[in-house]
Amino acid sequence: MSVALSHPRYPGLTVPAAETRPRARAARAYLVVSTLLAPLVVPTGPGQTAVLDVVNFFAIVAFAMFVVFPGRRTLRVPLVTPMVLVAIGSLIACGWAPSMSLAALALAQDVYLFAWFVVLVNLLHTRQDLRLVRVAWVWTAVLVSLGALAQLLFATGGSLGTLLGSRGVRPASTLYNPNMLADYLMMSVFVALSLAAEIRRLPLLLSLGIMGIALLATKSNGGMIAFAAGGLTWCIAMVATGPAHRRGSIFATAMLVASLGGALFWLGSEYGMGDRVFQALSEHTFVGRMEHSSQSRLRIWDQLEVAFARSPLGIGPGNSASLTMGIADRERPDSYRSKEAHSDYLAFAIERGPLGIVGLLGLLAALFAQVAVYWRASRRTSGGAPRRARLWTAAMLAVLAGSVVHSLVIEKLHFRHYWLFIALLCASALISTGRTAGDPVEAA
């Protein structure tokens, strides 16, 4: 759901084109800068602040002073209902927070990221703006990927021999850790695919190859599984939105592949075929890390389950890491503090209570609904779905599906690049239906 919080104070007043051009150029420059800086989070400042946060502070203040308060245009605020539910649940849970400072920091991050999201949605006016940001995203992702590969080569003396190994360097490039980098690259691959009808094939293939190698270098099992989920969703979406006469052959091919996969699975379970291959993968590639990672997360989640039983309304935002563990249960050799939840769903349920998890699920449902709005509007306004609309629809669904899966084992709701993407998604729905920031429309 999105609402119009304000209306133009003088709806009949025409703004001269000469006056709007500098503002449009400034808005586009800011959008590009935000895209370039979104994955640049190191070095880290106080409270995990980054360079982008300083830029955004001035941008949010300027947007409020020169756009919102003068009432020059309608302010579009998508996703307001689920975010209000999250906020109410978070405030209630603060009553049981072991650390109010951590709760206050988490709430401040919520407010800041949503304010930035609103600014982005209201600055994205046209399809050209959306394309500009996506192109900037892809080039930024290529640079980030090259940074990750440079870290790997520097640490290994120029060798790629440990790229698929179970041990070795896991580069983070300009992000906090390899798992965060994997999440960013997973999203970036599908953003790049959305431009397949708008940029040349060779640069696209090169950028996809660089990002793919960097994604492998992270050795992130969660990132790989999320990418697989997104890739499957992308294929299904492209088939479902494509020409009807091609669906039969594609469906037959898919059934053949599924049948072969089922036969191989039966042979493996019945006669043990493939056991050596799986054992080799577990011993010599990063797939073998999956068991260790799962055990570590299960210990964390067991402790959070105990905390939830004590405080069913929540333990306060950001307070998963403030719990004190016993000697036998401690998760760090040098500390009695617990670790973060490593799951958005568990974090919202345990830290923010029932309203928090309902708000999170509502947020995800609203995002999928926004994609449906975009697709229906694109088909209606274009007299049929153009290829670029199919590609962007498939990319949005793929990123959402990958994020839904990745959120099982990572907390990504405070990732700046994630909020940048959902701003693109919501702006796409508004633009496709003709409801941009300058249009005085009702709640939608």
Report residues per predicted region.
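Transmembrane signal-anchor hairpin modules in multi-pass inner-membrane enzymes, especially those
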Residues: 1-105, 125-135, 198-202, 245-252, ...
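Transmembrane alpha-helices of multi-pass inner-membrane enzymes
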Residues: 58-63, 231, 363-366, 370, ...
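Alpha-helical transmembrane segments of multi-pass inner-membrane proteins
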Residues: 91-92, 115, 131-167, 173-241, ...
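Loop-to-helix entry and N-terminal half of a specific, functionally important transmembrane alpha helix
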Residues: 30-36, 141, 339, 343, ...
